[in-house]
Design a protein with these regions (language model features):
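Generic secondary-structure signature for well-ordered alpha-helical cores
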Residues: 7-14, 29, 113-116, 142, ...
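Conserved beta-strand positions in the central sheet of alpha/beta enzyme cores
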Residues: 92-94, 149, 172, 196, ...
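Flexible, glycine/charged-enriched surface loops at secondary-structure junctions
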Residues: 15-20, 53-56, 147-151, 225-226
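Conserved, mostly hydrophobic/aromatic
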Residues: 5, 37, 50, 93, ...
Length: 247
């Protein structure tokens, strides 16, 4: 990927956002590589202006809430992991679900009992069977979950739209809206309530564009990390301070 992109990027000015974007968008897929390059070039441009990236991005607020991801595992292990994060000040937990939905529900119940003041939401990673999704969302709503991320497979477009129309729990779009093009489709179909932006794959340029699109349609938004280093997570976190990031 770099071998292809390097000669096409060399010679462009760091502030030539249209030129850089054209080069990166002409290279299909490879979202992680393009996101990293886009962010690095924004960083280079900021420093060429004598500023840091956070100054160029002009944060709209000074505090954001963080969420801690609880993986799929034994209940006691997950609870111990949650205790560690809760002790560090975390009050929002993202609970991975999908391998054993009955066990997932029991784990959510134990978490709610152990941390009644914490907010929980589930990330199903497209794992719920369409015919069972409503039943699980109703059960999770009773347990006090805030919302559910990607409950159904992305290709189940009609089922996703129908589930969102039922209004059981707010739905988060992640893999269904990986690019601005994807997001426009999902907005037209009205399949979600909250957009999960991943700067690791959308860089700064596409993250800002997608955030603006979501805001225009009255959608909420959050910023998530994805297999990043601490430095990458820091750069992603900078975008969480943008206007329109509500969750």
């Amino acid at each position: 990927g770099l071998e292809y992109l390097r000669p096409r990027l060399l010679g462009l000015e760091a502030d030539d956002q249209e030129g850089i974007r054209a080069v990166l968008e002409a290279f299909p897929f490879n979202f992680g590589l393009k996101g990293a390059l886009d962010t690095a070039l924004w960083e280079a441009w900021a420093r060429s202006e004598g500023e840091e990236l956070y100054q160029v991005l002009k944060p709209a607020k000074h505090r954001v809430r963080v969420a801690y991801i609880l993986g799929l595992g034994e209940e006691d292990e997950v609870l111990e992991d949650a205790r560690m994060a809760f002790g560090a000040g975390v009050r929002v937990f993202k609970v991975k679900v999908g391998r054993d939905l009955e066990a997932d529900t029991r784990r959510i119940l134990r978490l709610k009992e152990a941390f009644p003041e914490a907010e929980l939401y589930a990330d199903a990673n497209e794992s719920l069977p369409p015919k069972e999704a409503e039943r699980y969302l109703l059960a999770w709503k009773e347990l006090g979950l805030r919302y559910v991320e990607e409950p159904l497979p992305v290709e189940e477009v009609e089922a996703r739209r129908a589930l969102r129309e039922k209004g059981i729990l707010p739905l988060i779009a992640d893999d269904a809206a990986m690019t601005p093009k994807d997001l426009r489709r999902e907005l037209a179909l009205n399949t979600f309530d909250v957009l999960n932006l991943k700067p690791a794959r959308t860089g700064v340029t596409w993250t800002l564009e997608m955030l603006a699109l979501a805001r225009e349609r009255g959608k909420k938004a959050m910023v998530g990390s994805q297999a990043q280093s601490a430095f990458g997570a820091y750069q992603s976190a900078l975008l969480a301070f943008q206007q329109g990031v509500t969750e």
